[in-house]
């Protein structure tokens, strides 16, 4: 005959746990008697053991910790063995850390992703290669000093306009045209 173990640990024998015998409304001795009479009703014998709330041994917990720590060490060793064949061309060489200053293989700062908005190289959209036909920019924003030097090469001096066609002057510029009702064509 089994005796219920009175557990003092509230994590295993808390209120509302149906498997804890000391928390049930019925008496434990009546429950065991009922179980033995139910077993005699059936012709075949099946060994059913009632669930009993017991305290865990602290020795078991300390025994499990070194094995789980060992599994983590084995996984780390396997990762290190996989990284031995990698060269320095893709990412950083194996055995180095992020704090050593190596950038990722796409040219972004460490710890960033493509979604953060860093381009792979200047002048191309994300996810494209040189073979896709995008020109790599020379490193200057458009409309910078080089564009101004091209205008100087066209041969326009400071006194002449860059636009060779005559332009109509607005009425605001000429005060005389505002007072008179006639519109005079500009003289060339």
Swiss-Prot record:
Region Disordered, residue ranges: 80-141
Pfam families found in the cross-reference section: DUF5568 (PF17724)
Compositional bias ranges of the Basic residues kind: 80-92
Positions bearing Phosphoserine: 37, 121, 180
InterPro entries (alphabetical): DUF5568
Compositionally biased region (Polar residues): 94-107
Location of cross-link Glycyl lysine isopeptide (Lys-Gly) (interchain with G-Cter in SUMO2): 75, 184
Keyword set, alphabetical order: Isopeptide bond, Phosphoprotein, Ubl conjugation
Similarity annotation: Belongs to the UPF0461 family.
The protein's name in its UniProt record: UPF0461 protein C5orf24 homolog
Source species: Mus musculus (Mouse)
